[in-house]
Amino acid sequence: MYNCAIILAAGEGKRMKSSKPKVLHKICGKEMINVVIDVVKKAQIKDINVVIGKNSEKVKKATEVKNTSYSFQDKQLGTGHAVLCASDFLKNKRGIVAVFTGDSPLIKENTIKNMLDFHEAGGYGATILTSIVQNPFGYGRIIREEDEQVLKIVEHKDCLQEELQVKEINSGMYCFDIESLIESLGKIRNNNAQGEYYLTDVIEILKQEGKKIGALPIPFEETMGVNSRVQLAEAEKIMRNRINKIHMENGVTLIDHNNTYIDLDIQIGKDTIIYPGNVFQGDTVIGENCIFYPNSRIQSSVIKDNVTVENSVVLESTIGENTSVGPFAYIRPETTIGKSVKIGDFVEVKKSTIGDNTKVSHLTYIGDAEVGSKCNFGCGTVVVNYNGKNKNKTLIGNNSFIGCNTNLVSPVKVNDNTYIAAGSTITDEVPEGALAIARARQVNKKSWVYKKGLKK
């Protein structure tokens, strides 16, 4: 049967106290609205409409790669009005429409699939995802008849005293027969405490028309909506625990899973060991048998097999097999580091290529450079790539030995099999096989200290 989805994302989220729309706040590295869109797509719902309102352009920009359509809700008149604004999306469609909220990012793929199967198998006009909670304050209540069939949903502010005692709550997520939903939307009224058009009223309307109403209980954490920074932190903690559990089940060792921060969609190979304090962001891919000692940040990078990283930052770069990075290294965007390379303490590499088996052991800056294989950089080497206006290129050939405290003033080329003497400032090309010395000769002035009377 055909199915589609509407995601409600027009709410302003005033309790977030933010200048950006609520649904654009991130959970584990991804905007909440995109988390919801992605999980809906994984549940095999491809036709998705997002209802947007104030700041609509920001939401559209954040979701434009998701191939969704959009409806606009100009005034915040309730969830029923929001779905009504998507009428053009539903026009001439037959089948099932699922309705989700863009601020409920914890719903699971299997739950959505189960809801669709449950709805279709039961022949329901509407199906509600519900949950049983001990403290239902603030949630709409599921009111059932004596035979346990769903009668209606009553919003918290409209509940009678006995209805307030009900523990089964509405998650705000549903699926409907499309034709039944369209007919019912025109019948809802705003005669309630909020003066809004509730989507929940559709349930009672369908019931009165003889339609069957289904209710599928799910774990409460999946129903959690995010309306404040506190709830955002709570949702992120739940999602982070899910992510970490999946990686551990797939063969990754997390020494302290409560203090390891892995974004959604990160890939990590088996037998990798991760110590606490590490942060993995963006679309990072990590190979097998890697070790991440405490307190590194890896963002949108590819880390190949058998890499060791210690207390370092790697941004939008690629690290080859059997390489070690850190401690206190800084790998900046557009860097490619080869196999069996050593990037040591207080080394910064920016927009450069480092060949296989090269050693950059400590206190070095390499920027806008192409470095060959089997090179060695002495302590204090600086690639001087910026002249105040432009960034210039440095080329360093294979098997080059760069002595300590060397400046390579770009643009400059150092050919294969060369040596550069410590303390040199290199401004000209170094021929293959040459030793370059670019420093003043040492002068010793005998007895100078005593003649000056500095010491007796």
UniProtKB/Swiss-Prot annotation:
Taxonomically, which superkingdom?
Answer: Bacteria
Task: Name one cellular component (GO) term.
Answer: membrane
Residues the record lists as binding Mg(2+): 103, 227
The record's region (N-acetyltransferase) falls at: 251-456
* Cofactor note text: Binds 1 Mg(2+) ion per subunit.
Summarize where acetyl-CoA binds, as residue positions. Answer: 385-386, 422, 439
Q: Which cofactor does it need?
A: Mg(2+)
Q: What class of enzyme is it?
A: transferase
Entry GO MF terms: glucosamine-1-phosphate N-acetyltransferase activity; magnesium ion binding; UDP-N-acetylglucosamine diphosphorylase activity
The entry's function note states: Catalyzes the last two sequential reactions in the de novo biosynthetic pathway for UDP-N-acetylglucosamine (UDP-GlcNAc). The C-terminal domain catalyzes the transfer of acetyl group from acetyl coenzyme A to glucosamine-1-phosphate (GlcN-1-P) to produce N-acetylglucosamine-1-phosphate (GlcNAc-1-P), which is converted into UDP-GlcNAc by the transfer of uridine 5-monophosphate (from uridine 5-triphosphate), a reaction catalyzed by the N-terminal domain.
PANTHER family referenced in this protein's UniProt entry, alphabetically: BIFUNCTIONAL PROTEIN GLMU, NUCLEOTIDYL TRANSFERASE
Q: Give the family from UniProt.
A: In the N-terminal section; belongs to the N-acetylglucosamine-1-phosphate uridyltransferase family.
- Partners and quaternary state? Homotrimer.
By what name is this protein known?
A: Bifunctional protein GlmU
